């Protein structure tokens, strides 16, 4: 009877391990606006070949406008400091800012995103320069940020993207 219990326990453990591995391939970020209230959510999924797919929906943003979207270096979203607590763009390679910069981009630089007429940003963005849990390029524990203006993809150090409107810690 004891060997049968051990086999049953081991088989349950074997089934549980792949599920745990799957959890490491995903993350979430709950966004907080300037007022400190939750205004959106992102689901992040690690791609098998590298990079991370970010699917997000954030409300309460300026309607009909392109806005900058970045990964920031620090996983702190403090509305009292206008989300300055999130630090600068995630940049493990010490590159220049911007996808149009000769020595860029930062790993956290991503294309501008469009906010619809309803003030909601809905997007799917792929960042090929990051992973969820890599030693140098991992973004779990860092922050996603939506800015008030579009990124010009060149200005140093942050693309003249303007005020930080919404921030979410990647967990």
Segments predicted by a language model, with ranges:
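Bacterial N-terminal signal peptides
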Residues: 5-15
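N-terminal leader/targeting pre-sequences
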Residues: 17-171
């Amino acid at each position: 009877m004891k060997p049968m219990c051990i086999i049953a326990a081991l088989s349950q453990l074997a089934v549980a391990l792949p599920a745990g591995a799957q959890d490491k391939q995903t993350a979430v970020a709950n966004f907080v606006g300037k007022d400190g209230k939750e205004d959106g959510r992102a689901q992040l999924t690690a791609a098998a070949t590298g990079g991370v797919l970010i699917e997000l929906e954030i409300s309460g943003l300026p309607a009909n406008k392109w806005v900058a979207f970045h990964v920031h270096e620090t996983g702190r979203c403090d509305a009292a400091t206008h989300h300055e607590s999130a630090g600068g763009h995630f940049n493990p390679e010490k590159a220049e800012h911007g996808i149009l910069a000769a020595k860029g981009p930062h790993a956290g630089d991503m294309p501008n995103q469009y906010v619809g007429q309803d003030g909601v940003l809905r997007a799917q963005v792929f960042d090929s320069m990051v992973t969820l849990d890599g030693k140098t390029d991992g973004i779990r524990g860092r922050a996603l940020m939506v800015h008030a203006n579009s990124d010009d993809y060149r200005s140093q150090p942050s693309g003249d993207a303007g005020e930080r409107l919404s921030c979410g810690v990647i967990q």
